[in-house]
């Protein structure tokens, strides 16, 4: 006979709420003082929970930050996917999706600056997660370009290669970093034409 679960719907809801509050607190604390200077005491105080609750969800502050990074990256990727218009030429799809992406980032300038900068300070694990997220974005670009109705008669698998898709994401990422350094996150949508051109230029020349 199967033993009854000790996790009720109420318990699950409470755990979800605590995790959400901890992630929000991590965002605020890391934005104000950086991950290196942040302490678990800072995070739980901001979240209004105990240290015990923190350790029920995360091993350390770095794990908490990486969870925040993954969560916000997934939200940004969802914005990109929702902006795709499959019946339009891929060039139009890319431009529309990137404009929505930049608008999404510009809506939270403090968080964007924290995530894009602080991830570089988390050593090999931070690098691994960053590459994981960049690969997901590259897959999106690859699918959008190669799945679009206008590929110039070139076999879809040859319009944009995985390597060039990753290069496009890397280039766009650097444009965002530059905007952060200049304090121009609120103007990110102005990068849409340039970022779209990066993707177009990295497709095969005979697919133009």
Spans of model-derived segments:
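C-terminal peripheral helix-coil segments that are non-catalytic and often amphipathic
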Residues: 1-7, 103, 107, 139, ...
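Generic hydrophobic, amphipathic alpha-helix propensity
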Residues: 15-26, 43, 68-76
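Amphipathic alpha-helical segments that line or abut small-molecule/effector binding pockets
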Residues: 24, 91-106, 166, 170, ...
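Hydrophobic alpha-helical connector segments
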Residues: 67, 81-110, 157
């Amino acid at each position: 006979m199967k033993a009854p679960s000790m996790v009720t719907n109420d318990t699950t809801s409470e755990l979800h709420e605590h995790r959400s509050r901890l992630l929000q607190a991590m965002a605020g604390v890391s934005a104000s003082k950086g991950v290196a200077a942040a302490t678990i005491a800072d995070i739980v105080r901001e979240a209004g929970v105990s240290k015990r609750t923190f350790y029920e969800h995360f091993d350390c502050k770095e794990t908490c930050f990486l969870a925040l990074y993954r969560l916000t990256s997934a939200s940004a990727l969802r914005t990109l996917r929702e902006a795709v218009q499959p019946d339009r030429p891929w060039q139009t799809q890319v431009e529309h999706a990137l404009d929505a992406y930049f608008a999404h980032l510009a809506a939270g300038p403090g968080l964007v600056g924290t995530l894009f900068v602080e991830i570089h300070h988390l050593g090999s694990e931070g690098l691994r997660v960053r590459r994981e997220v960049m690969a997901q974005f590259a897959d999106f670009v690859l699918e959008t370009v190669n799945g679009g109705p206008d590929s110039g008669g070139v076999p879809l698998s040859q319009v944009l290669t995985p390597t060039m898709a990753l290069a496009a994401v890397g280039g766009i990422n650097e444009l965002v970093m530059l905007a952060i350094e200049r304090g121009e996150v609120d103007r990110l949508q102005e990068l849409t034409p340039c970022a779209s051109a990066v993707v177009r230029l990295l497709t095969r020349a005979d697919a133009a």
